Curated annotation (Swiss-Prot):
InterPro entries per the UniProt record, alphabetical: PsdUridine_synth_cat_dom_sf, PsdUridine_synth_N, PUA_sf, tRNA_psdUridine_synth_TruB, tRNA_sdUridine_synth_fam1_C, TruB_C
HAMAP family documented for this protein: TruB_bact (MF_01080)
Family: Belongs to the pseudouridine synthase TruB family. Type 1 subfamily.
Keyword terms, alphabetized: Isomerase, tRNA processing
Catalytic residues, chain numbering: D47
Enzyme Commission code(s) on record: 5.4.99.25
Annotated protein name in UniProt: tRNA pseudouridine synthase B
UniProt catalytic activity: uridine(55) in tRNA = pseudouridine(55) in tRNA
Cited function: Responsible for synthesis of pseudouridine from uracil-55 in the psi GC loop of transfer RNAs.
Superkingdom of this protein's organism: Bacteria
Gene Ontology terms: biological process: mRNA pseudouridine synthesis; tRNA pseudouridine synthesis
Length: 319
């Protein structure tokens, strides 16, 4: 007999505003527990020091997490000049202290130089794995292991403000996936000749998702209390916070098909649409309803890439 999943079936995406001081995985587990969800995953870890947007994918949405992992991100970062640390943030030990003798003009010039494509080595204090073990675990043992250089793209890095009394600068960064803001700050400190480390990092956007859609754990707890006071199911308020699955796929081309074609597609059969399909993943909509992603097969027909099990129940299997 198959083992029954604990929890209830929940499908959708929650834009959690992760608080400071907890790991992304702990935030995920707390949220999954509150929703009593059978299945959940996050898309793109934030350090315990960092706050901000952490998309939590429930149920069928977990099939499309890669699209959010691959998308660009936006951050607001504050950096302390004059101090370099082992981790490039305030969680690490200070390894050097220098006087800060920089002007706003110098800051603006050096910050602007980071815009564009470049190579970046991941920090040893990151969750990337080497031989199945996170890099930060090696770093804590004083072991440095080889890391592959990554191509990154800084779409924009703007100077926001400079607190000259405390030697703290604030910047806004719009970057490609896999970009380490701590590394950018550390490199900036070296260019300025004084060292620097991150003291605040807040992710304001993941792809097209805006900051206004974020929900905090405190807000979720307040809704739970409201549901209890009104003697209604928590899902009455919690599920209203979830975004549709296909909001993770806004950058994909869309193919619209009929309900009959959707029935064929949802049961794993390829469809000849008699059109020139684009390369790569395609968002498939049947009779106005999102039913999964597809791709072009060798014959030029539309085949299933990732289908939705929930949609199979809505269709009768074709003869």
């Amino acid at each position: 007999m198959a083992k029954r999943s604990k929890g209830r079936p929940v499908d959708g995406i929650l834009l959690l505003n992760k608080p400071i001081g907890i790991s992304s995985n702990k935030a995920l587990q707390q949220t999954k527990g509150v929703y009593f969800a059978q299945k959940a995953g996050h898309t793109g870890a934030l350090d315990p020091l960092a706050t901000g947007m952490l998309p939590i994918c429930f149920g069928e949405a977990t099939k499309f997490t890669q699209f959010l992992l691959d998308t660009d991100k936006t951050y607001v970062v504050r950096a302390k000049l004059g101090e370099r640390t082992t981790t490039s943030d305030s969680d690490g030990e200070i390894v050097s202290t220098k006087d800060v003798n920089v002007t706003r003009e110098q800051l603006i010039k050096e910050i602007a130089a980071f815009v564009g494509e470049s190579d970046q080595y991941p920090s040893m204090y990151s969750a990337l794995k080497y031989q199945g073990r996170p890099l930060y675990k090696y770093a804590r043992e004083g072991i440095e292991v080889p890391r592959k250089c990554r191509k990154i793209n800084v779409f924009s890095l703007t100077f926001d403000e400079f607190d000259e009394v405390n030697n703290v600068i604030q910047m806004t960064a719009h970057v490609s996936k896999g970009t380490y803001i701590r590394t950018i700050v550390d490199d900036l400190g070296e260019k300025l000749g004084c060292g620097a480390h991150v003291v605040m990092l807040h992710r304001t956007a993941v792809g097209q998702y805006p900051a206004e859609k974020m929900v905090s754990l405190d807000e979720i707890e307040a809704l739970l209390a409201k549901a209890k006071d009104e003697e209604v199911a928590p899902s009455t308020y919690l599920d209203a916070l979830l975004l549709p699955l296909d909001t993770a796929l806004v950058d994909l081309p869309v193919v619209e098909i009929s309900k009959e074609q959707g029935s064929i597609f949802s049961h794993g059969q390829a469809i000849d649409l008699d059109i020139d399909l684009p390369e790569g993943a395609i968002k498939v909509v049947a009779d106005g309803i999102f039913i999964g992603t597809g791709e072009r097969n060798a014959s030029g027909h539309l085949k299933v890439k990732r289908g939705l099990a929930s949609q199979q129940d809505d269709y009768v299997k074709p003869e």
